[in-house]
Amino acid sequence: MTDAEQTIKNQKTQEAEQSLRVFLRSENATLPTRGSVLSAGYDIYASEEAVIPAQGQGLVGTDISVAVPIGTYGRVAPRSGLAVKHGISTGAGVIDADYRGEVKVVLFNHAQKDFTIQKGDRIAQLVLEKIVMADIKQITAEELDITARGEGGFGSTGKN
């Protein structure tokens, strides 16, 4: 392989590593979209009709599989409009870089009435976040840095 061919191969590899690659598993799947040029997340769509019961939860399919860029993971986050207008939030939202199964969305309905999702509705957003892959090192209590906060948690730093 010539130097030029190797350079082109390296460029293509880098481009693939920086792309959100999406496989549409069926004709019911919709490619994720961004609401605006500066949107942090990609809207993801339901591939099926579903009803999330009042005060309940449900698992909604998207019929997509993704390959996130190296050094990132995908976080499934709520859509603000669904949260404010309908009391819908998301859960269990980590997509690891090596996961290749269908992306499914856990939805919680905090409202007092059932919420119906139609095929093609935007149900969540996928946000790519950088990660640090740190080695784990077991330490002793003496090696644990002392901080001003100490063991305070669960509201210990303020009144509200």
Curated annotation (Swiss-Prot):
Top-level enzyme category: hydrolase
Keyword Magnesium: yes
Species of origin: Debaryomyces hansenii (strain ATCC 36239 / CBS 767 / BCRC 21394 / JCM 1990 / NBRC 0083 / IGC 2968) (Yeast)
Binding site for dUMP: 80, 93, 96, 99, 104, 149, 154-155
Cofactor dependency: Mg(2+)
Cited InterPro entries: dUTPase, dUTPase-like, dUTPase-like_sf, dUTPase_trimeric
Protein name listed in UniProt: Deoxyuridine 5'-triphosphate nucleotidohydrolase
Record text on subunit structure and interactions: Homotrimer.
Domain of life from the UniProt record: Eukaryota
Pathway(s) this gene product operates in, as recorded in its UniProt entry: Pyrimidine metabolism; dUMP biosynthesis; dUMP from dCTP (dUTP route): step 2/2
Sequence similarity: Belongs to the dUTPase family.
Catalyses which reaction(s): dUTP + H2O = dUMP + diphosphate + H(+)
E.C. number: 3.6.1.23
A UniProt-annotated Pfam family: dUTPase
Function according to Swiss-Prot or TrEMBL: Involved in nucleotide metabolism via production of dUMP, the immediate precursor of thymidine nucleotides, and decreases the intracellular concentration of dUTP so that uracil cannot be incorporated into DNA.
Molecular function, one GO term: dUTP diphosphatase activity
Keyword field: Hydrolase, Magnesium, Metal-binding, Nucleotide metabolism
